[in-house]
Swiss-Prot record:
Sorted UniProt keywords: Repeat, WD repeat
Protein name as annotated: Putative BTB/POZ domain and WD-repeat protein R61
WD repeat ranges per the UniProt record: 149-189, 208-248, 250-285, 291-330, 333-371, 422-464
Stated family: Belongs to the mimivirus BTB/WD family.
Source taxon at top rank: Viruses
Annotated transmembrane regions: none
Residues of the BTB domain: 8-78
Amino acid sequence: MDSQQYNSNINLILNDEHHTETLNVDKKILIEKCEYFSRMLTQFSEINADTITIKVVDSNIAKNVIMSMFSDIDIYKNIGNCCDWKYLLLLYKCCDFFNISFDITKLNKLLVPNEGFELLLDIIDIIGYNYDMIELIINNLPKNYDLGKFPRELLETLYDHSTSYNIVSGSLDRTIKIWNVETQDFNSKIFTKLSKTLRYFPINKEQIFDNNIKCMDYSHKFNQIISGSNGGIKLWNIDNREVIKEFQCDYKINDICFSPDGKSCVCANKFLSIYDLDNGRRKVLNLTRIKSIGCIKTCVCWTSDNIIACGDSDGVIEFWNAETNLIIKWCQVSKSRISNISFSPDRSQIAVSNQTKIILYDSIFDKKILEIKNSYIINFAYSPTEDVLVLIDGYLIKLYNCRTGNLFRTFNLYDCSSQNTMYFSLQSKIHFSPTGNQIIFTCDTKNENLVGIWNWKLNDDIIYLKGHQKQITSLCIIPDSENSTNKRIMNMLKNQ
């Protein structure tokens, strides 16, 4: 292109289904400021054109976007040809079409009427289904929308990231309580006493068991909780609070975890035991490493359909193939007991902790990424929405960037001015809420055993849930199955 062509003006005719706008603009500025026009006017047949016709989603908005290259125009300010929500969505489409940057955070709190939901889905499909976009779908989902239009994977994600959730806590007082976060109360009690025969009890009745609750896990596949105690495993239906099945065992259960498909579970004790939850058959993974005799399995997680990771009391991490009963690999990561093991939500990291440090590895456990050292680590958890790791260190709650290892927030639970001082015990647990803005943890005072809820984003006062008579030993977060949207999603998942 010669200098005269490069510096000449060009006519742009912007057409939508109902309207046409015409612009006469500087070709040089278009090329310099917009990749779309740079490619069009230097590489394609339009290189020598004086007039170009472009089909756009909205000619007025497209004109505004193009003119922002030539003057200081706030493109996010509605120019008045449609309502605010529609303007913002069409603006994104125009910016995406012309490959012009758009501030995605402008969409985060957007509310659209039912008739705008399909347009919203079109925009989200372009952006991608990240956490903010999932929350946008949840907040705008029409009451009678046909959920059958969504693929199963999206339905599961919507259910797991519901903003309406319950907290489930198990205790040495032999109870499991399901707490409703909005009412700050528990809506039912499940008193657990191991019995040889399964009996049905109404929700307002108590059923007494022999053994303390040691550990729990939740499966969204069937909306079930599994609990382990010193002598028994129970499978619970969340919807009606009934015991579905129970399995007796003659060993102490240190940790329990559902398989990804929800059809089996793995228990950690001296060995790994896998239970088929349909028929109750138990398979023991009991091959031993050299020098592993006498070690116990302290924590466990299911990494994929067939692979199980567990931590041992001698500081070793093992990976087992659940089908072949063989150890795939093992690694000495510490000289002391492994207390926790967890995958990041995006499955790119696996974190392992002992008393004084958390070590982050890549997902296949071949490369150590970083170490986070502390004084007395009790428990940790990944955020479901950000690159954030939260941990309990002594009396402190600490927040780290899990990619860099940088500490960016600390909260001290200990209040020396209070006569009823709170503290973390060795059994304390910590989790994020599904939205990632709240941290849920267990703690104790001299006379009380508590569940705390802290909105660390807003730095609100902590809400404490009281009800357990003895120390809380397990904690999990579940979608609120009474929420109407959650009910519809769960019913759709069950019927697919």
